[in-house]
Amino acid sequence: MSHLADLVERALAAINDAQDVAALDNVRVEYLGKKGHLTLQMTTLRELPAEERPAAGAVINEAKQQVQDALNAQKNALESAVMNARLAQETIDVSLPGRRIENGGLHPVTRTIDRIETFFGELGFSVETGPEIEDDYHNFDALNIPAHHPARADHDTFWFDATRLLRTQTSGVQIRTMKNQQPPIRVIAPGRVYRNDYDQTHTPMFHQMEGLIVDKNISFTNLKGTLHDFLNNFFEDDMQVRFRPSYFPFTEPSAEVDVMGKNGKWLEVLGCGMVHPNVLSNAGIDPEVYSGFAFGMGMERLTMLRYGVTDLRAFFENDLRFLKQFK
């Protein structure tokens, strides 16, 4: 057994001298492997009398366990040392300036839409949407727009065939709403619309917001008061507003609304009017009982006026130098 004690002492010394996990594994193989020094000690048991073998085997197993415990402890120590060294190399200097993650921002037209939806939402209006590929009935016929009206011409409208087109206005949403809901009705209809035009103040696709109220005893006074309050809220100022007589097939009387600009000139901002009796009838609403008003405005136009943008096309060019100004 003195030889066994010597093997254990040598194994423990080798374990203590191991400087890395690989060297430590070599020690394990040398002493506890299949042909390791301590493992082979079990073969000496056959030379002992049968009654001595259990006690001798227990001593050998105890020696092997002592070496295994030392191996485990040294392995943990070596792995901890490696981890600590790695962490020391990867230590973050908290005094250094952080890498800034740049936040995105809402598109200025989206800001305008959200602002308008919030204002009218507080007045009890709900938001309704509809298809961008529209039929001629909802886009023209139901809105009292005659067959000879220039808005139906190819040079103004994108037609797919004789009855299908890219909608030129969101008014079709109003028709569907009036057919599906009973008065009182208060809705706004934001969305993309399409017209065959492209210059500094027009694009083939733009965003429009239309509003509609239908109820008993709705008057032009209600229309003027609502829009005046809206414009004051949108431009965050006590605006000078005027209503000019105009013509739209779907409203009667009709008006265009201007606000006084900072340069002392009137600026057109939207169109409006009392819903034409024919439009109410087309939607299944009795014009003898109910009346209503409607209005429509271009989101890009209002955004240009609010932020002082001079070219509408800038909203669609995705120039970050331009868009970052609105964050």
From Swiss-Prot:
User: Which top EC class is given?
Assistant: ligase
Any one GO CC term of this protein is: cytoplasm
The organism sits in which domain of life?
Bacteria
Q: How does it assemble?
A: Tetramer of two alpha and two beta subunits.
Q: Which GO terms describe its biological process?
A: phenylalanyl-tRNA aminoacylation
Q: Which NCBIfam families match?
A: pheS (TIGR00468)
Q: Mind telling me what this protein is named?
A: Phenylalanine--tRNA ligase alpha subunit
Looking up InterPro entries in the UniProt record yields: aa-tRNA-synth_II, aa-tRNA-synth_II/BPL/LPL, Phe-tRNA-synth_IIc_asu, Phe-tRNA_ligase_II_N, Phe_tRNA_ligase_alpha1_bac, Phenylalanyl-tRNA_Synthase, tRNA-bd_arm
- Coiled-coil ranges (or none): none
Reactions catalysed, as given in the entry: tRNA(Phe) + L-phenylalanine + ATP = L-phenylalanyl-tRNA(Phe) + AMP + diphosphate + H(+)
Q: Which CDD domains match?
A: PheRS_alpha_core
Q: According to its UniProt record, where is this protein located? A: Cytoplasm
A molecular function GO annotation: magnesium ion binding
Q: Which organism is it from?
A: Erwinia tasmaniensis (strain DSM 17950 / CFBP 7177 / CIP 109463 / NCPPB 4357 / Et1/99)
- Gene3D superfamilies in UniProt: Bira Bifunctional Protein, Domain 2 (3.30.930.10)
Tell whether Ribosomal protein is among the UniProt keywords. Answer: no
Write out the entry's keywords from A to Z. Aminoacyl-tRNA synthetase, ATP-binding, Cytoplasm, Ligase, Magnesium, Metal-binding, Nucleotide-binding, Protein biosynthesis
So what EC number does this one have? 6.1.1.20
Q: Where primarily located?
A: cytoplasm
